[in-house]
From Swiss-Prot:
This is Glycine--tRNA ligase. It comes from Methanocaldococcus jannaschii (strain ATCC 43067 / DSM 2661 / JAL-1 / JCM 10045 / NBRC 100440) (Methanococcus jannaschii). The gene is glyS. The keyword Glycoprotein does not apply. HAMAP family: Gly_tRNA_synth_A. One of its GO terms (cellular component) is cytoplasm. It comes from the Archaea. It is an enzyme of class 6 (ligase). It catalyses: tRNA(Gly) + glycine + ATP = glycyl-tRNA(Gly) + AMP + diphosphate. One of its GO terms (biological process) is glycyl-tRNA aminoacylation. The keyword Mitochondrion does not apply. Belongs to the class-II aminoacyl-tRNA synthetase family. Keywords: Aminoacyl-tRNA synthetase, ATP-binding, Cytoplasm, Ligase, Nucleotide-binding, Protein biosynthesis.
Amino acid sequence: MEKDIYEKIMDLAKRRGYLWSSFEIYGGIAGFVDYGPLGCLLKNNIISKFREQYIIKEGFYEIESPTVTPYEVLKASGHVDNFTDPIVECKNCLESFRADHLIEEFVDVDTEGKTLKELDELIRKHNIRCPKCGGELGEVKKFNLMFVTSIGPGGKRTGYMRPETAQGIFIQFRRLAQFFRNKLPFGVVQIGKSYRNEISPRQGVIRLREFTQAEIEYFVHPERKEHEKFDLVKDEVVPLLPAERQMDENLSDDEKVIKISIGEAVEKGIIRHQTIAYFIALTKRFLEAIGIDKDKIRFRQHLPNEMAHYAIDCWDAEIYTERFGWIECVGIADRTDYDLRSHSAHSGVELSVFVELDEEREIETYEINLNYKVVGKIFKKDTKAIEAYINNLSEKEKEEFVKNIENDGKVIINIDGKEFEILKDYVEIKKVKKVIKGEKVIPHVIEPSYGIDRITYCLLEHSYREEEDRVYLDLKPSIAPIKAYVLPLVNKDDMPKIAKEIEQMLRENGIIAEYDDSGAIGRRYMRADEIGVPFCITVDGQTLEDRTVTVRERNTREQVRVKIDELVDYLKERLKE
């Protein structure tokens, strides 16, 4: 039976030093992967392109925070309570499986957004058994996906391996706002490892327990989600799969996807606002720039029942793969002020910016203070969070709060998914006049989150080419791990010496090159092609006469002669491709 493309790529990746199974000599563990020498170079080149786009061109700044995160942070963010997947255990062999994925393996049904009860009913209805031993499956339950650890000796303080890099940015919001002089909008990048204790990872490099994220948290005024550079992308045509069309049973899968300009998608309300649309356009451009097939990219909107607990809108950049179908590689979410408001409530530290007005003005506003004699006894340890919530209300939110409490005698507030009923006698409200120069604003956050490992695999698959006499990776020169192979035609005269000098010259000029004198020249070309080297430089007899070399281009196999003195400039120009 012929191997599918995934098997071919993984075979090449293992032989040539792109990807290896982790802990291989001990039998390996699913959900972990090692990057070999070429894999590291490729992955780092992708990350460099990411930094080029977002840090250099967009003017964002990067920070780095710890991967170990205290319980309090992830309780406030909602991950302790909400970062879960459905799990089912075999009653016989005790093997665990992710329930929704297991059902989809046996039944042609979409399990996205199904409740635990609905998943349980599907298992019973279709008599789905344990795929390992055929035993009966137990009840579907929630499983928290975070790796738990302890901070310090004695296990007194619980910590987790971070499930996303974003929380490190939110925690430092006060410092970041100060760095950006309290001017909105501003963008912050973090690139690093995140962790997800997958129940039964069976998709190789697609579903990892430890993975690299490149995330942007873009802080905006909650009432100003236009983007100043929107005109630069408004004509970009993108393939969109809106939630409404996904749910339309009268449309085929192909008909559900629409190709539309970014500008028109915003005008028609398909994309919620300009800032999400802007990042969708940038994501498309980035993926195409590194070499992802433009015909295998689409942007799918999350359905209401699959939206993350912190988001009001989210679009995934999905990339098509032969074995796994469409896989999510980038998520672009409007997280509103959920994170900053939650951390403010839990920590008691105000996380807002002061937005100056064009000119001073006198306003009527409300001072809302808690009646501690009453609420302290009722809410106890939650009193601090409630006070922080009220203190962070904007002028508009204060008006709404007072209006509701006057009309209904109470207000229901929600802090991290927990509801509190605030009665009229719990607060003291005063109407006052004051002159203001601006207002406190809790910014909303637009978050593009890139899964670098999935993107790396997709790039390998989309670059894989087979011809009658060779296999090669059609990697763009700017992305390819090794830029040039330097080859003496034969191992005699001064050819090896000159070839080694050229290799050193290229490396000193920032071009990663590799010397190879092993085997016939044709075999060496094939070896270079298979790992995606865009240029082979051959030192031959003519080199000894006129100091020129042949430069062979990987895809076309065409060769040109270039003077050694001009080789660096020639390659640097070609490596921009």
